């Protein structure tokens, strides 16, 4: 039973009254039933207190299921490879992958043997957290079944979960930066037939084309911004952090906000991904941190030289080796509702599974391609985040990343109360240096996709005794920077984290220097430079970096667009005058009240991306913040392309049914709760720090699917952390919940909230409610 503040001294447990005990008394011994206290504050955020890990996990699983039962149940179906069984093979996942391809990947990835090995590698604390989570989730499921499951998941695919399900979810997270990007290429890999030439149906071609786009946009769609400000630059002389991860607003990568406490051992608040009984991004009494998706490589492809006598054998150092053949069977729902087992052979080399991408990674009589994912051997990820959660100093925090090396595919930025700002690119990266890359890869391919020679053992990953895992870089050879002014990151390489101390000379698989920066990084460095010149940086300054919604690229090219409008319209003046008027009236932002000029600007710049000569000032590695810039409208080729882009933009806006009076808030919305809520922000590629990814909706609207998610600005004073934050898509994914849209409304209005952290702050919250649960009480 949940009770509010006036009654917080007592709860009902069955028919008896029970005093709410201090957390130390919630569990008397490890072998007794788990108990947890769940205190909810504004927006339904749970503050969970328990005496040990099992009790804490119990509270996390219970609270999460209260808010997101359907979401997690659906993800459990996915990672078990059962989507074709329940929904049919031709339907698509939330990520627009075919159910069949997804099922094949997860049946292969999450074998009983792999799960057993992963579980065996977990420390007792992690096992207890997961066991408690399972018990808490299943208790909430039982309670909700009694009342009636939420409509979206009132179906037979919702079931109690096990610790194996949590392991499956974790392993899915690990391969997001590797083999998970090759789902279609993995599922479609078949040896060439001797009887007929390689044939690929149109549906597979389309799926692979979509996969190629996803692969290229991985860092964008799983992107982030983060700024860590040190004592030299912060307004109060202490550490200050902005966390602005850009993650999906639904599915298995949707953040959940919570506060976890084991008195005397753990006190951490922030956000976590589904199924994880710990905090991924957050703060504790001593420090605050965030992550940004890195540009490092977390897998390599290996070109196999095939045995001329058998295309399922490959040559390694001149010796013929048979590919491994693993049969995977997927249950598939038939049109009549019956189930049929569909078997598939997954081929692999010593490096990993064979993948086939027609026209890119062909499996023919001469060659095939095998993928080695470094994170497949990373069983340290949960231990890593839990160690970070417990860190009582920045040194302890940094040491844990050096020792455990469990971060899969993100950078880490952190500050402490003393005002030290730290950047670490310490993720799991294959140990392949520039010399080996030059010797073992085809230079024509470049470094976007690393393809090594799979016919020579010397081209395999190097082994370092310092590394936590065979074949990856030791942390001592990866980028890191400790500053007293600032470090920042927005999904570029590590080299311009702080222009005063460029990070150079690393393996191309880790970080490449001298490369153009993305528009968000240029915006951040420009803004921080201006603030640095003006004096100090405040928490309000960091909030404004996100919330003022400046379109940074507009400052570089809008004057040229308006100049073109004034003198180059020619015979198209009648058609283009409304567009030019809208551009002139536009405020250069992605705010709710920004005019239709922003829509025109987006369409124009999207069209111009393919024009190589569009920049008047090309990229200069000596001036990466301010180059490239300016549209070269004096170039006839650029002028012609610009005219075509403008005309196309006019047609597209008209087709969408938008009027000259349309505002950005009328167009970009979130309808997750069932009603459209206006959402500010815009495309990351235009330099909008408050990045949003959208898909086409009804009536010309754009529906947000990814972008700014969990926001926090953390500062410190004598009492500890002071934090403000928001969860842009709200705490619950259940449209019927009171907390399915409340924070989304607040985000729309740019209303940050104080995040209650201390006991006094939590209990003083106007929405304070408390619930005590125990395994004994659920029997």
Swiss-Prot record:
Heterodimer of an alpha subunit and a beta subunit processed from the same precursor. Residues 202-223 form a propeptide. The keyword Cell membrane does not apply. Its EC number is 3.5.1.97. It comes from Pseudomonas savastanoi pv. phaseolicola (strain 1448A / Race 6) (Pseudomonas syringae pv. phaseolicola (strain 1448A / Race 6)). Residues 731-752 are annotated as: Disordered. Residues 1-25 form the signal peptide. It is found in: Periplasm. GO terms for molecular function: hydrolase activity, acting on carbon-nitrogen (but not peptide) bonds, in linear amides. GO terms for biological process: antibiotic biosynthetic process; quorum sensing. It catalyses: an N-acyl-L-homoserine lactone + H2O = L-homoserine lactone + a carboxylate. Pfam families: Penicil_amidase. AHL-mediated signaling mediates quorum sensing in many species of Proteobacteria, regulating hundreds of genes, including many that code for extracellular virulence factors. This is Acyl-homoserine lactone acylase PvdQ. Gene3D superfamilies: 1.10.1400.10, 2.30.120.10, Glutamine Phosphoribosylpyrophosphate, subunit 1, domain 1, Penicillin Amidohydrolase, domain 1. Keywords: Hydrolase, Periplasm, Quorum sensing, Signal, Zymogen. Residues 731-746 have a biased composition (Polar residues). The active site is at 224 (nucleophile). InterPro entries: Ntn_hydrolases_N (IPR029055), Penicillin_amidase_A-knob (IPR043147), Penicillin_amidase_dom1 (IPR023343), Penicillin_amidase_N_B-knob (IPR043146), S45 (IPR002692). The gene is pvdQ.
């Amino acid at each position: 039973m949940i009770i509010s503040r006036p009654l917080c001294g007592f709860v009902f447990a069955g028919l008896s009254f029970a005093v709410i005990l201090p957390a130390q008394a919630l569990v008397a011994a490890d072998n007794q039933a788990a108990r947890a206290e769940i205190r909810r504050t504004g927006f339904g955020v749970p503050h969970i207190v328990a005496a040990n890990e099992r009790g804490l996990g119990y509270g996390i699983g219970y609270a999460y299921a209260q808010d997101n039962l359907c979401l997690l149940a659906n993800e459990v179906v996915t990672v078990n490879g059962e989507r074709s069984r329940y929904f049919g093979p031709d339907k698509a996942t939330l990520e627009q992958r075919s159910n069949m391809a997804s099922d094949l990947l997860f049946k292969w990835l999450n074998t009983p043997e792999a799960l057993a090995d992963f579980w065996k590698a977990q420390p007792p604390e992690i096992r207890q957290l997961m066991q408690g989570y399972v018990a808490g989730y299943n208790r909430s499921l039982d309670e909700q079944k009694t009342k009636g499951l939420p409509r979206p998941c009132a179906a037979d695919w919702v079931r109690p979960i096990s610790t194996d399900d949590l392991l499956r979810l974790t392993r899915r997270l690990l391969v997001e930066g590797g083999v998970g990007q090759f789902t279609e290429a993995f599922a479609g890999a078949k040896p060439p037939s001797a009887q007929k030439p390689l044939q690929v149906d149109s549906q597979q071609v389309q799926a692979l084309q979509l996969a190629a786009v996803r692969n290229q946009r991985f860092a964008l769609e799983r992107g982030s911004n983060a700024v860590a400000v040190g004592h030299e630059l912060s307004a109060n002389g202490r550490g200050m952090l902005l966390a602005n991860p850009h993650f999906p607003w639904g599915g298995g990568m949707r953040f959940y906000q919570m506060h976890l406490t084991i008195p005397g051992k753990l006190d951490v608040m922030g956000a976590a991904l589904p199924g994880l009984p710990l905090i991924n991004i957050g703060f504790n009494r001593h420090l605050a941190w965030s992550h940004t998706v890195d540009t490092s490589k977390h897998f390599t492809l290996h070109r196999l030289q095939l045995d001329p006598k058998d295309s399922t054998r490959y040559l390694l150092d001149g010796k013929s080796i048979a590919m491994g053949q693993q049969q995977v069977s997927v249950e598939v729902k038939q049109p009549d509702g019956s189930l049929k087992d569909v078997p598939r052979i997954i081929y692999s080399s010593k490096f990993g599974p064979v993948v086939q991408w027609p026209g890119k990674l062909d499996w023919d009589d001469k060659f095939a391609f095998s993928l080695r994912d470094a994170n497949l051997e990373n069983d340290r990820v949960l231990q890593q985040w839990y160690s970070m959660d417990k860190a009582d100093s920045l040194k302890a925090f940094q040491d844990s990343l050096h020792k455990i090396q469990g971060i899969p595919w993100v950078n880490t930025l952190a500050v402490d109360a003393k005002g030290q700002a730290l950047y670490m690119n310490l993720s799991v990266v294959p140990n392949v240096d520039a010399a080996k890359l030059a010797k073992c890869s085809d230079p024509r391919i470049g470094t976007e996709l690393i393809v090594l020679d799979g016919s020579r053992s010397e081209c395999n990953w190097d082994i370092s005794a310092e590394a936590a895992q065979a074949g990856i870089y030791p942390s001592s050879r990866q980028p890191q920077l400790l500053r007293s002014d600032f470090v920042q990151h927005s999904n570029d390489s590590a080299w311009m984290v702080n222009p005063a101390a460029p990070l150079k000379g690393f393996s191309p698989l880790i970080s490449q220097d001298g490369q153009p920066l993305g528009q968000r990084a240029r915006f951040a460095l420009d803004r921080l430079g201006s603030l640095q010149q003006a004096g100090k940086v405040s928490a309000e300054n960091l909030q404004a970096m996100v919330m003022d919604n400046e379109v940074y690229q507009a400052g570089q090219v809008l004057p040229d667009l308006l100049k073109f409008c004034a003198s180059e319209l020619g015979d198209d003046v009648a058609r283009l005058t409304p567009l030019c008027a809208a551009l002139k009236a536009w405020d250069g932002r992605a705010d709710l009240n920004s005019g239709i000029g922003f829509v025109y600007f987006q369409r124009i710049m999207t069209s111009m991306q393919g024009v190589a000569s569009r920049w008047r000032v090309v990229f200069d590695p000596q001036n990466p913040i301010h180059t490239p810039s300016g549209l070269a409208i004096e170039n006839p080729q650029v002028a012609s392309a610009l005219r075509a882009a403008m005309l196309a933009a006019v047609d597209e806006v008209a087709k969408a049914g938008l009027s000259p009076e349309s505002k950005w808030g009328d167009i970009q919305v979130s309808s997750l709760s069932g009603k459209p809520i206006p959402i500010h922000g815009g495309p990351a590629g235009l330099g909008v720090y408050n990045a949003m990814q959208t898909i086409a909706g009804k009536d010309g609207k754009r529906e947000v699917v990814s972008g700014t998610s969990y926001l926090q600005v953390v500062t410190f004073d004598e009492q500890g952390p002071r934090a403000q934050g928001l969860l842009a898509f709200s705490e619950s994914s259940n449209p019927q919940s009171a907390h399915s849209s409340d924070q989304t409304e607040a985000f729309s209005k740019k209303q940050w909230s104080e995040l209650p952290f201390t006991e006094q702050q939590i209990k003083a919250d106007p929405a304070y409610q408390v619930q005590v649960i125990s395994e004994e009480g659920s029997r």
